[in-house]
């Protein structure tokens, strides 16, 4: 049976936390900031955790991620 490979696109977008969770960065942060308020832009800078509904699926793609 072949080795299971890490999904490289996902490996670039998610990081493991110390407690075993997955950290992600927010969308809508590359351009078109003139339509967003200062508060929206400030909150988009912060990372957030992956939701529980997506966690199992993403974890399967990141089999060998430390």
Curated annotation (Swiss-Prot):
Gene3D superfamilies: 4.10.410.60
Gene Ontology BP annotations: translation
Protein name in the entry: Large ribosomal subunit protein bL35
Pfam families, per the entry: Ribosomal_L35p
Family: Belongs to the bacterial ribosomal protein bL35 family.
UniProt region (Disordered), positions on chain: 1-21
Compositionally biased region (Basic residues): 1-16
Top-rank taxon, per record: Bacteria
HAMAP family linked to this entry: Ribosomal_bL35
Species of the source: Streptococcus gordonii (strain Challis / ATCC 35105 / BCRC 15272 / CH1 / DL1 / V288)
